[in-house]
A protein has these predicted regions:
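Mature extracytoplasmic or organellar-lumen-exposed domains after removal of signal/transit peptides
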Residues: 1-276, 280
């Protein structure tokens, strides 16, 4: 890869981008920002992010919460929602002084960044996109052929990676559907050539936004279904190592097997707990 310092990719403070409403699924009636800080604080007091006492796998809790409470929330409840309105982030003005892109271009591109697809991902198969994320196919990741993988533009992340994983089974086409809608919506904004979007153009942009977010939500639903199945399977695995009572697990081999089952259960429960999207009203 061409990056050794993550700050060269982005210095964004994600806590400030978290869902600002109450998160009832976490104790204390906290906001999204407070939940994220709380998880990180508690993870710091554990061994490798795993809390054996309460069965929390913070590596999963933090990553999955961030994907829903920051990435999906920001894209579909902010950049592709109110920021596509006529009176918000106008297209006939630079995003800020000195910027060579408009407010609408910036907002649309921000949402694409949260989606997490490689810039050339739409030219690849689902398996290629999946293997790129798994670092099993770095040749196809290297779009410009410079012998390096650019982590900002040539790698898949987060829900885009999930989509590729589901699509490679051949029954869905989430990755390309969402990515193409991003490309087509961006083209409408580009074709306006720095002028205000017409009502027809804005309707077209919002139509693509609905395609993006409705399919993105399906990706999340698929993940919930997957993790729910994993939780059930791991409950059965835990039962099998308990012999009816966890305190009766005897012998180092049995104890190790039991602890491994508990860790898997905690991992997938953590995945399931905060895989769901944050509340939003963009579809209303």
């Amino acid at each position: 890869v061409d990056v050794t310092d993550i700050n060269t990719v982005s210095k964004t403070n994600l806590s400030g981008k978290a869902y600002k409403g109450s998160m009832p699924g976490w104790p204390g009636n906290m906001t999204g920002k407070e939940v994220l800080a709380s998880m990180i604080d508690m993870a710091a007091g554990t061994e490798k992010g795993y809390d054996a006492q309460y069965g929390y796998d913070y590596a999963q809790l933090v990553s999955k919460f961030t994907m829903g409470g920051v990435f999906y929330h920001q894209a579909c409840d902010n950049y592709l929602d109110e920021k596509m309105n006529a009176d918000n982030k106008p297209n006939d003005k630079p995003y800020k002084d000195g910027a060579y892109y408009t407010g609408k271009e910036h907002s649309w591109d921000e949402a694409f960044g949260y989606w997490g697809a490689a810039a050339h991902g739409a030219t690849l198969s689902p398996k290629q996109n999946y293997d790129i994320t798994k670092k099993k196919n770095m040749r196809d990741a290297d779009a410009n052929g410079d012998g390096l993988v650019n982590l900002k533009s040539e790698m898949n992340y987060a829900h885009a990676y999930y989509a590729a994983g589901f699509d490679k089974g051949g029954n869905t086409n989430y990755y390309n559907t969402i990515t193409k809608a991003f490309i087509d919506g961006r083209q409408i904004i580009t074709d306006a050539k720095g002028e205000k979007l017409s009502d027809a153009q804005r309707r077209g942009v919002k139509r693509h936004a609905r395609t993006i977010c409705s399919n993105w939500e399906k990706v999340i639903a698929e993940a919930v279904f997957k993790y729910a199945g994993s939780v059930y399977s791991n409950i059965e695995a835990v039962k099998a190592t308990m012999g009816g009572n966890m305190w009766k697990v005897k012998g180092s081999a049995e104890k190790t097997e039991h602890q491994a089952a508990l860790r898997k259960y905690a991992k997938y429960w953590g995945c399931l707990l905060y895989t769901s999207p944050s509340p939003r009203d963009w579809m209303v």
